[in-house]
C-alpha cells in the first residue's frame, strides 16, 4: 500500500528546495499544439499533478472549466496566487491522484504533464482506477511522459511506447502517440518525451 503522506512530503520538499526542473513557468507548447490541431473545444477539464498551475491557468484562459489537483500544498499555494493575478477561476484540489475520490461528473478533457510517468512507479493500478473514475466514454486524455528512447543522466522517468499502449490501453483507444521535447526553464529545449492523446472507450 502506498504511503500517500510520504508522497506529499516528498513533493513539498522538492518545491521548498526549489528543486523543480520540470516547472518551466511556461505553458506547455505541446498542449497548445494538440489543442490547435485537434480542435478540442472548451469543456470541463482536469489537470492531474498541476504543480504551480501554469497549464491549468492557460486552459482557464482558453475558456475551459478547469479543476486541477496536486498533492503539494506549496505548489498549490503558488498556483492560487498565479490564478488570482491572471484573473481566472480554477478549482484547486489538494489530494493524491492515487487515492482521490472525485466528487462530481467525469471530465471531458484530462491533461497530465508528467503525473502518469511518476505515479505509475508508486501504484499503477491506483492511478488507472483514478483515470477510470474521472473519465467517461469519449473523454480525451493527453499525457506527456518521459521517453526511454533518449538516455539522459537527469530527466523524467522514461517509458517505451509499448508500455504506454499496454498500460493505458486498458481504458483508452490511442488517437495519437508522437515524440516531442519538454521545455526547461528559460525556454531551453528539455528532455525527449511522448505526447499521448487517448480517447476513453
Model-derived regions: residue spans:
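Class I (Rossmann-like) S-adenosyl-L-methionine-dependent methyltransferase catalytic domain
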Residues: 2-46, 52-102, 119-134, 139-201
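Conserved acidic functional residues
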Residues: 55, 112-113
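Short catalytic micro-motifs in class I SAM-dependent methyltransferases
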Residues: 114-118
Amino acid at each position: 500500500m502506498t504511503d500517500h503522506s510520504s508522497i506529499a512530503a516528498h513533493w513539498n520538499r522538492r518545491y521548498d528546495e526549489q528543486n523543480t526542473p520540470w516547472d518551466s513557468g511556461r505553458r506547455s507548447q505541446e498542449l497548445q499544439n494538440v489543442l490547435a490541431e485537434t480542435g478540442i473545444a472548451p469543456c470541463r477539464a482536469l489537470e492531474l499533478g498541476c504543480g504551480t498551475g501554469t497549464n491549468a491557468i492557460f486552459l482557464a484562459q482558453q475558456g475551459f472549466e478547469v479543476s486541477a489537483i496536486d498533492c503539494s500544498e506549496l505548489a498549490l499555494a503558488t498556483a492560487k496566487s498565479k490564478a488570482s493575478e491572471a484573473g481566472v477561476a480554477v478549482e484547486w484540489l489538494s489530494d493524491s491522484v492515487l487515492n482521490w475520490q472525485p466528487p462530481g461528473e467525469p471530465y471531458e478533457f484530462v491533461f497530465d504533464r508528467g503525473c502518469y510517468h511518476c505515479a505509475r512507479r508508486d501504484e499503477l493500478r491506483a492511478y488507472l482506477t483514478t483515470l477510470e473514475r474521472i473519465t467517461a466514454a469519449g473523454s480525451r486524455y493527453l499525457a506527456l511522459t518521459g521517453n526511454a528512447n533518449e538516455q539522459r543522466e537527469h530527466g523524467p522517468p522514461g517509458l517505451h511506447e509499448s508500455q504506454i499502449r499496454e498500460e493505458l490501453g486498458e481504458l483508452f483507444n490511442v488517437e495519437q502517440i508522437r515524440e516531442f521535447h519538454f521545455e526547461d526553464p528559460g525556454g531551453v529545449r528539455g528532455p525527449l518525451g511522448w505526447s499521448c492523446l487517448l480517447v476513453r472507450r
